[in-house]
Amino acid sequence: MPEENLKPSEPHAKRLDPDNIKDMVSQLPEPVGYRLLVLPFTPKEKTKGGILFSQEQLDKARIATTCGYVLKMGDLAYQDKEKFNKPWCKIGDWVMFARYAGARLPIEGGEVRILNDDEVLGTIGDPESVLHYI
C-alpha cells in the first residue's frame, strides 16, 4: 500500500484542546478505578516569531509531551488513604506526568491517555510555560 494512503487526509487538522473537546468528552472512555483520562497538551504549529514546525517535529512533540488536561477521573482516584491525604488534581487541571506514562488511545484529531492517579507528578497553570520539543 502506498505510504500516502496511510497519512491522514488533513495533516494540519484543528488541534484538540480543552475548549474544542468539550462536546466529545461524553463519548470518550470512562476511566475505571484509580485512573484518570487526560488530554495531552498539543503544541502550537508556529512559534511566536512565525516559524512553522514540520509535521515530524509536531508528531515527536505530541508523543513526548509531559502535560495534559484532566477530562475525567475514575471513582477510586485518590481514595487510597495510605498513598494520598488529598487529591493531587481535579477535573479541569493541567497536570504533568512522565514522558511515556499511561495508555495512549487515538481519537479523532489526536489522542487521550489513561493514567494511574499516582502517575501525576504535579499540576501546572499554563502548559505553554514548559518546553515540549525534543
Describe each model-derived feature in a short phrase.
Residues 2-134:
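Compact, glycine-rich, soluble single-domain proteins
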